[in-house]
Regions:
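Conserved Rossmann-fold NAD(P)-dependent oxidoreductase catalytic core, especially the SDR/UDP-sugar
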Residues: 1-33, 37-39, 43-49
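Flexible, glycine-rich beta-alpha linker
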Residues: 21-24, 44-63, 112
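Short, hinge-like loop/turn segments at secondary-structure boundaries
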Residues: 27-29, 61-65, 123, 148-151
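Low-complexity, charge- and small-residue-enriched intrinsically disordered regions
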Residues: 70-85, 146-170
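Mid/C-terminal beta-alpha module of Rossmann-like enzyme folds, strongest
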Residues: 91, 95-155, 169-200
């Protein structure tokens, strides 16, 4: 980036993408962020959890699962803390205006299990769904087999490990620093994304 014209860079990473991460995906994200932070261009690394926005794949997948009468998930007790895509955009804009430097976590206002997230989404759609948990070890075995069978498998062990996480953080300091409080509530977020039915 030396000699470039950019005055500020905002790099969106993943919660847990730290130097100490053992997961390959998180580790590579951490390395990329560190490279930008060490460059001559002012950089803000923003680590976010599951992001939900109108018309995106994560929101489509959540709605699809909520409409099912039965869901099978690997460790549905894992904690999510969804963040609205519009709040990510606001954070990026605020960071650029302030030319903020450094790495920051920003998560949504409400932590809940993946099971509860699907059930709440189903309830907002006027539906009921049952979520059956599967052992994560089974998923790791299956994804390992897929890695051996396909050059570009649909899911890898590293991807599954990223999904098997627990987000339950207080990032109000980041909100205050960027002056983007309050964040969009989970219910308001779900209302926004459920009004968009198109497949991304």
């Amino acid at each position: 980036l030396q000699g470039g014209s950019a005055a500020h860079i905002s790099y969106v990473s993943i919660v847990g993408a730290l130097e100490t991460a053992t997961n390959r995906c998180l580790k590579s994200k951490s390395i990329a962020g560190d490279m930008l932070l060490k460059s001559t261009t002012k950089t803000m690394v923003l680590r976010v959890p599951m992001v939900l926005g109108e018309g995106d794949y994560a929101s489509y997948a959540l709605r699809r699962n909520a409409l099912k009468s039965l869901n099978f998930l690997f460790r549905p007790s894992s904690m999510d803390q969804p963040l609205y895509a519009g709040d990510v955009v606001r954070a990026i804009k605020a960071g650029a205006v302030k030319e903020l430097e450094g790495a920051y976590d920003l998560v949504g206002p409400e932590p809940l299990s993946r099971r509860d997230l699907i059930k709440r989404t189903a309830s907002m759609l006027g539906r009921r769904t049952k979520v059956v948990g599967l052992p994560i070890a089974l998923g790791l075995i299956l994804s390992g087999l897929l890695e051996k069978l396909f050059s570009n498998p649909p899911v890898t062990r590293s991807m599954l490990e990223v999904l098997d996480h627990d987000d339950n953080m207080d990032t109000s300091h980041t909100e205050e620093l960027l002056k983007i409080s309050p964040l969009v509530s989970l219910d308001a977020m779900l209302e926004k994304i459920l009004n968009t039915h198109e497949r991304p």
